[in-house]
Amino acid sequence: MLYVDKYRPKDLSELNYHPHLTEQLESLVASADVPHLLFYGPSGAGKKTRITCLLKALYGPGAHKLKVDQRVFLNPSKRKIEVNLISSNYHTEITPSDAGIYDRLVIQDILKEIAQTQQVDQNAARRFKTVVINEADSLSRDAQAALRRTMEKYMRNMRLILCANSTSRIIAPIRSRCLLLRVGAPKDEDVMRVLRHVAKREKFHLPDNISSDIARNADGNVRKAILVLETLRVPVSYTHLT
């Protein structure tokens, strides 16, 4: 397993940086009324990791028991469109932009189906199901309009978590219906702390000059930094670590 997957935080308490954002997510979990959410920020900053940790905090460890399904949709000319769904009993993750110009069709069908389906686990901590929409800023205007209508109609039993690099291409009616959560690129010191944590867990010594170089060249992309660390693993005894 790659380091980036092996050491990805699974709980809010394990998140390594942006403590103010972690506190905000913990407050959301404690709240009885969770709004639609829009996570935005540069690639590799940790948006998906925070969404995954939030889902576990909302629903428990069952949110990490995932399955992958391939769904087939027919466009107006009866051509098949295949889209992969990642789901647990409590949430579904989709990337509608995989459907290209037919993303509106995917949004309408999947969200309507999920919204009209009862929570599988009757003892679930939350009565609503959650849909995570990746690359929300790549959705067409038609798909975003369909999404807006869905947000209004099915708020009672469904919440949306949108993930995007930027909010600039997301229509105002969607932004106004979401709590905006910015996940900024971490500082080099934050990235270095993550790298030291991985190195310690893997029992090898990571010189400060190497971790500094990796962090600087990663330009705030933690995923990239960890991948580079694995490639450049320094074969020095763990006894150097305190």
Where are these regions (language model features)?
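P-loop/Walker A NTP-binding region and its immediately flanking N-terminal helices
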Residues: 1-145, 152-161, 169-173
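Short loop-to-helix capping motifs
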Residues: 18, 220-221
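Conserved H-loop
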Residues: 165
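Conserved AAA+ ATPase "sensor/coupling" helix adjacent to the nucleotide-binding pocket
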Residues: 177, 193-202, 231-232
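Conserved AAA+ ATPase "SRH/arginine-finger" region at the nucleotide-binding site
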Residues: 180-190
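An amphipathic alpha-helix signature
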Residues: 188-196, 215
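C-terminal helical "lid" of AAA+/P-loop NTPase domains
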Residues: 212-217, 223-235
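Conserved small/polar residues in nucleotide/adenosyl-binding loops
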Residues: 239-242
